[in-house]
Amino acid sequence: MTSVGLAPVSGLRESSSHSVGVDRLPEEMNDMRIRDDKEIEAAIVDGNGTETGHIIVTTIGGRHGQPKQTISYMAERIVGQGSFGVVFQAKCLETGETVAIKKVLQDKRYKNRELQTMRLLDHPNVVCLKHCFFSTTEKDEVYLNLVLEYVPETVHRVIKHYNKLNQRMPLILVKLYTYQIFRALSYIHHTIGVCHRDIKPQNLLVNPHTHQVKLCDFGSAKVLVKGEPNISYICSRYYRAPELIFGATEYTTAIDIWSAGCVLAELLLGQPLFPGESGVDQLVEIIKVLGTPTREEIKCMNPNYNEFKFPQIKAHPWHKIFHKRMPPEAVDLVSRLLQYSPNLRCTALEAVTHAFFDELRDPNTRLPNGRVLPPLFNFKAHELKGVSAENLLKLVPEHARKQCPSLGL
């Protein structure tokens, strides 16, 4: 285990010692490894390490003959807070690179599932884990700090930006954002086997210059095993699939598809499609649009749900929910995503091949500011495993095939 210090900065109380020993962590924590064995610990003794100007010094390397390297992060500002802990923006003093550090209280009895998941992820549309370290407080609490790439904006804030201007988001951005969401979901669902369980605009990061989207916050993510129960109270309101509202515990990755459908509808409308303060409110909003679910649909969502006391309401036609000038492909994709029966929803990869995204496959398409689109077709072979030859040619348009030499197209 390493021994590291906290570098005092002006305006902060200097600790009595410049080098603070880190308590030995429980054995199960010692087993945790991330890509490239970059596991680090740091001791924090002055406050919680997230105040502006606070400096955290950590050591990486030292394994397999690698030289030890000191990395110092200066906390700049808090960018997110919740029941999980805190996310703060920080700057690496050695390189000048800006990062996001997610700091969560670590229960010593368990491995951290978010860290275990993030170790597996490597995709252009998923936020990248750079490394991690543990920190301890004076109260002997252990915190896990995930050092992540910093992406300055969220889809949520982009929606708010256009609402303030009283404008609809340009359709090219709607296509660009949702295409990348489905690419990320296809990767985590089929390559990694993980369900995110909290897809919402706040968890979709956007680079405002390139419009590249990255899925973040894997704090609720889980590998779903058939036959094993899961908690139904996950996913944020407005984006919760109906089977979760019905209390299903044997759900599938189709809950993420429903959430992504809600995000797409919100980008098109400028407001949530199914607002509701409670599960019942939410269900009422869904029924107003999709109509009352049939007995068969309820059985598909939760076989144990026998109460059937809903008012009989007819489905509201999708073309009446959206503006009459809305492209029919957009309406068609929303209708394929927002199905009561989880097994009738299209998969993430099927969504990526949908005609709604054909404009993105046109080599002449540009961003509203005239710039080229971010990389959209840099697939790796494992992402397209089992894809038919016909769909393969659709997924990787001719002009982009040199981006994927390993696919042999």
From Swiss-Prot:
Pfam families: Pkinase. ATP binds at residues 79-87, 102. Autophosphorylated mainly on threonine and serine residues. The keyword Lyase does not apply. SMART domains: S_TKc. The active site is at residue 198. InterPro entries: GSK-3 (IPR050591), Kinase-like_dom_sf (IPR011009), Prot_kinase_dom (IPR000719), Protein_kinase_ATP_BS (IPR017441), Ser/Thr_kinase_AS (IPR008271), STKc_GSK3 (IPR039192). GO terms for cellular component: cytoplasm; nucleus. It catalyses: L-seryl-[protein] + ATP = O-phospho-L-seryl-[protein] + ADP + H(+); L-threonyl-[protein] + ATP = O-phospho-L-threonyl-[protein] + ADP + H(+). GO terms for molecular function: ATP binding; protein serine kinase activity; protein serine/threonine kinase activity. It is an enzyme of class 2 (transferase). One of its GO terms (biological process) is signal transduction. Keywords: ATP-binding, Kinase, Nucleotide-binding, Phosphoprotein, Serine/threonine-protein kinase, Transferase. Gene3D superfamilies: Phosphorylase Kinase, domain 1 (3.30.200.20), Transferase(Phosphotransferase) domain 1 (1.10.510.10). Its EC number is 2.7.11.1. Residues 1-27 are annotated as: Disordered. Belongs to the protein kinase superfamily. CMGC Ser/Thr protein kinase family. GSK-3 subfamily. May mediate extracellular signals to regulate transcription in differentiating cells. This is Shaggy-related protein kinase NtK-1. It comes from Nicotiana tabacum.
